[in-house]
């Protein structure tokens, strides 16, 4: 049985809760750090969280949705829905500054600035995330 919200949380509070939901592929990041949460809407007796996956076929999308729903249930939200929004497409530009720092410490340096400017644009990492050396090369566009 689906019941109404036990307590009507504010959207800002839900955003804070989502800071605790890790990305299943890179668990040092929250889904907020990654920038995939696009909107939180509290209306009536339902919370709707809109998510843009990092790519349209992302295999972690179902796990992320379940994790969001579980995080909300733990706080008394009994009616939640996760909506997928594919457009505009996610870019590394959406990663938060805190998320970029966490990735750097984890050994990953995502592209910076105008990531969607075009396929021909390739921004090499600025520095090695481990030692800070400027002698770096891109190893992989994906993962």
Say what each PLM segment does.
Residues 1-143:
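Domain-level signature for proteins that mediate thiol-based redox and metal-cofactor handling
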């Amino acid at each position: 049985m689906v019941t109404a919200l036990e307590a009507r949380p504010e959207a800002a509070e839900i955003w804070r809760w989502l800071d605790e939901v890790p990305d299943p592929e890179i668990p040092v990041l929250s889904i907020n750090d990654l920038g995939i949460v696009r909107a939180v809407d509290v209306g009536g007796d339902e919370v709707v969280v809109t998510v843009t996956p990092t790519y349209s076929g992302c295999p972690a999308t179902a796990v992320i949705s379940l994790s969001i729903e579980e995080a909300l249930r733990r706080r008394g939200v009994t009616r939640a829905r996760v909506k997928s929004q594919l457009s505009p497409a996610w870019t590394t530009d959406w990663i938060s500054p805190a998320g970029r720092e966490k990735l750097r410490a984890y050994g990953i340096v995502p592209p910076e600035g105008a990531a969607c400017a075009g396929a021909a644009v390739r921004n090499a990492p600025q520095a090695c995330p481990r030692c800070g050396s400027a002698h770096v090369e891109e190893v992989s566009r994906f993962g």
